[in-house]
Amino acid sequence: SEHIYSNPNTFVRELLQNCVDAITALRNIDENYKGRIDVFLNEDKTVVFRDNGIGLKEEEVYRFLTVIGESSKRDTPDADDFIGRFGIGLLSCFVVTNEITVESRSAMGGQPVCWCGKVDGTYQLTLSDEERPIGSQVVLHPKGDWMHLFEYETFKKILVGYGEMLPYPIYLHYQGEEELVNTPSPVWLDPKATRKELLDYGAKVFQSSALDAFRIYTESGKVEGVLYVLPFRTQFSVRNSHKVYLKRMLLSEDDCNLLPSWAFFIRCLVNA
């Protein structure tokens, strides 16, 4: 895990990605289905990511959780609807924990299943006769070295950073309180948003007012976004940071060579 994922925060992105894809899979069957993601910071120091998506059956758990590189999304007809498809995301959790527990009940039927994997490569799978809602939850027991990541303010900042644009509501639960931490309908992705709304949003994101804002869209790459013109002089050699999203999941805040070198006076928000 540590060789694949250099950033210990990555597990938040990967678990949110799995939640979103599970809900999307169920919405592809029932477009009126209302999905949600719940994240719990518990007093016993466990962290739980829960979704009400499509869930997993026993044979799917064996195939997709116990074999590195297997993915339930890669070869499906609607694969383009999903964020992830490589089947290694769960490994990112082992950077911050020695044990991962996945509890799931499939919308397609079958008994609820519980899979517990450990950092040494061993795992245990059990079936349950207890009633549980459709969907999945992942339970982590953080390592001592990484406990600081699970302090409320720190964890919330990471969660919002990756998830604030995702299309389903994300609720953070802490000390008996529930808080919505994302905006499922962000203004910069709203084609009806006014110029003032775009400028106000850009000022909030980039901590600087812009002279103007321009929408961008490419049909071939299915890329949409907003370009912001900076109101001050910058050096030609300065590389501005941007925000790049993949299906609304934060991918990068680096320059990424998105713009030509002469566009040093531009910052942008992009979703692909």
Task: Indicate where each model-derived feature is located.
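GHKL (Bergerat-fold) ATPase N-terminal catalytic module, capturing the glycine-rich phosphate-binding loop
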Residues: 1-149
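GHKL/Bergerat-fold ATPase module in large chromosome/replication-associated machines
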Residues: 82, 102-124, 143-148, 153-272
